[in-house]
Amino acid sequence: MSTKTYDAGVKDYALTYWTPDYVPLDSDLLACFKVTPQAKVSREEAAAAVAAESSTGTWTTVWSDLLTDLDYYKGRAYRIEDVPGDKESFYAFIAYPLDLFEEGSIVNVLTSLVGNVFGFKAVRALRLEDIRFPLHYVKTCGGPPNGIQVERDRMDKYGRPFLGATVKPKLGLSAKNYGRAVYEMLRGGLDFTKDDENVNSQPFMRWQNRFEFVSEAVRKAQEETGERKGHYLNVTAPTCEEMFKRAEFAKECGAPIIMHDFLTGGFTANTSLANWCRDNGMLLHIHRAMHAVIDRNPKHGIHFRVLAKCLRLSGGDHLHTGTVVGKLEGDRQSTLGFVDQLRESFIPEDRSRGLFFDQDWGGMPGVMAVASGGIHVWHIPALVTIFGDDSVLQFGGGTQGHPWGNAAGAAANRVATEACVKARNEGVEIEKHAREVLSDAARHSPELAVAMETWKEIKFEFDVVDKLDAA
């Protein structure tokens, strides 16, 4: 218990919350913020203000500080670093005692770390760049309901990335026509098809009808190909009660996998659904709709690597990560960094990939990285190189935009992927020799040849907005 005398009034945050001599404990939750302070606010004061407002502090001294051990519970700003190439901002490293957070509650962690502090007047902009979750905390979270190895065993598919596609047009199809598209793509060679993130239960296609027609399509494709297939049935709903109603119906239909929009649906709903999937033997695909609102501004918000870590703790078997090469934002090194955070057991600090801390996941299962957004056959050599086997390569327009139809588009993607995996396994640098690898495969696949001709000029060569900070 504190023995300090109560001294009313307002004092600088740095007097209490700036502790440069502090050595973080293994059990501390560590955070790195990019801070852009207001003019005339010192770095130390701004860092301390963030530590205070995200832990025990308020704008004035309060007498009830004497009723607790403030030195034990407070967040501590313990280090400040320059941001390469940015004279306005700096990195503030803050350590939080684990007792500040409810066990297994990502909701509680985020409420503290990215709550009111992000509207604090002492800073002009604030971004949460990374979190180190101590193993003590990781062990209190359920994590992915199944994990990579369990999914491979259930789907009986090994040695290559999974292949998927989002049904297009994403809105407006009737349930019967929607099911037809699913069947054609699965029959053509894909492993999964997917509801778009904004397909819920609209007037043109109510969820029950979609689930029924899609389940029939999956069963038919499985019978004809002899392969296990699946469709991500989106159970995201206006209420948790309705979400579970849809999940139960998907289970009754025999679906192997369901889907949730984890940011718009919320972490409470997501963790609850992950627990249900674990108990009911269901795979869980996670879409990240709304992420760019939160993570794309390089000075304010939350970096996606943090959202990815939070999702792994909350629970999900797949997570969309961008593609690097497609239509969506994504720096290559940064993407490789957070993909490792999804899949590996231990990831060391690596500033070249935007990783500010070591992260130990213990025995928590991994999450499949999903590459989706503006990709086609010409991207496959790069995608296989970047994401490896434990991933889902998901082609929407890159399947259904094929001149010969959905089945041909699926066949082209399957042939191209298997050709790239084979060449890679034989030691070929497939990204460097992409044209030769694909052209050789196309000699035996007219579907691939047509796809290559159709999309040979299609590139998305825009500069990345959210780049890694580098000198």
Curated annotation (Swiss-Prot):
The UniProt record lists the keyword Magnesium: yes
Binding site for substrate: 116, 166, 170, 288, 320, 372
Names of required cofactors: Mg(2+)
UniProt-recorded Gene Ontology molecular function terms: magnesium ion binding; monooxygenase activity; ribulose-bisphosphate carboxylase activity
Catalysed reaction equations from the record: 2 (2R)-3-phosphoglycerate + 2 H(+) = D-ribulose 1,5-bisphosphate + CO2 + H2O; D-ribulose 1,5-bisphosphate + O2 = 2-phosphoglycolate + (2R)-3-phosphoglycerate + 2 H(+)
GO biological process, one term: reductive pentose-phosphate cycle
Cofactor note: Binds 1 Mg(2+) ion per subunit.
Modified positions (N6-carboxylysine) in chain numbering: 194
Site (Transition state stabilizer): 327
Protein's name according to its UniProt entry: Ribulose bisphosphate carboxylase large chain 2
Species this chain originates from: Allochromatium vinosum (strain ATCC 17899 / DSM 180 / NBRC 103801 / NCIMB 10441 / D)
Gene responsible for this protein: cbbL2
